[in-house]
Amino acid sequence: MGERFFRNEMPEFVPEDLSGEEETVTECKDSLTKLLSLPYKSFSEKLHRYALSIKDKVVWETWERSGKRVRDYNLYTGVLGTAYLLFKSYQVTRNEDDLKLCLENVEACDVASRDSERVTFICGYAGVCALGAVAAKCLGDDQLYDRYLARFRGIRLPSDLPYELLYGRAGYLWACLFLNKHIGQESISSERMRSVVEEIFRAGRQLGNKGTCPLMYEWHGKRYWGAAHGLAGIMNVLMHTELEPDEIKDVKGTLSYMIQNRFPSGNYLSSEGSKSDRLVHWCHGAPGVALTLVKAAQVYNTKEFVEAAMEAGEVVWSRGLLKRVGICHGISGNTYVFLSLYRLTRNPKYLYRAKAFASFLLDKSEKLISEGQMHGGDRPFSLFEGIGGMAYMLLDMNDPTQALFPGYEL
């Protein structure tokens, strides 16, 4: 178990130096504690500079170095992830050059994905069209906006499409929600979205059990619980939609089942029946479930979900300092748990913990990767596996009350 994460030896709390100047924080034992002592404004400015330098490196490695050719188009590991990072940079800095470069990336992804049968936001053509439409609207390019929106509306879902987030109906539905949030409700009609919601409930009830877990789904023969392929991801998307009373009851019942059947450690199973308490990732384990429980706490305002979200956060603090940098199964993704809990509770403890995980990355990740003690990711510049996701998270910490896990929180 210990091989997957670094032991978290960071203090439970480090008070900020009230002088407000980075140069005055000099009496600390080490560089990590010095970062933790910085006032948040100084700290976020430091993160901001570092994030923009990483963004430039990601653009070079994934876009310019290849001669602007796209082999892998998707948001998870490909060039669309670079486009999304550029869009985040534009949102934070208002630098239109980033927005224009974002659209340049999207257009290349559009060409590369034209024959793709994948229809989700993170791993499919829906992500290309959705991000393209939103970025074009921000730039004021009405012709391009209309083109991407029309292409999105032209997407048809295969009858054998699974239900999970990365490749299934939940992932398509998330793309619809993303569009409606950024360009206006009913951009994608409620009727169209409702038909997808109903199909997700129909399938989930077939495999579920009213007395235990009302909704259940399979992906490649396994009944996953996590954010990427399982219950947490599907419930998260459903809670962003208008549901009928019986549907709300089933979502709440499914989440309660997961809480009641988690590991004694507080971590969550990767799949139904699993006895292996190893994974503390966004994709599998407590981090992704925590984000879903925060959403449940916001929507249903019940003590059960608030407490369970905070308990999942304790697992992440204890075992979430992973030996990877990315957002899917790395420290950057786990940092979002604390940002989400801070948004829910406004408890400064969670902002400190987000600051601590980000400080660890800022202070140690380059050295640990170069020494082989930390993994830079199979696709080291990508949004979900590599430093692209780290840059995105660091930019998000500019305003922690608005920080949202990309492709998951809305």
From Swiss-Prot:
This is LanC-like protein GCR2. The keyword Zinc applies. Belongs to the LanC-like protein family. SUPFAM superfamilies: LanC-like. Zn(2+) binds at residues 283, 328-329. Gene3D superfamilies: 1.50.10.10. Disruption phenotype: No visible phenotype under normal growth conditions. However, in growth conditions described in PubMed:17347412 mutant plants have decreased sensitivity to abscisic acid (ABA). It comes from Arabidopsis thaliana. Transmembrane segments: none annotated. Keywords: Abscisic acid signaling pathway, Metal-binding, Zinc. GO terms for biological process: abscisic acid-activated signaling pathway; carbohydrate metabolic process; maintenance of seed dormancy; peptide modification; regulation of abscisic acid-activated signaling pathway. GO terms for molecular function: abscisic acid binding; metal ion binding. May interact (via C-terminus) with GPA1. The keyword Metal-binding applies.
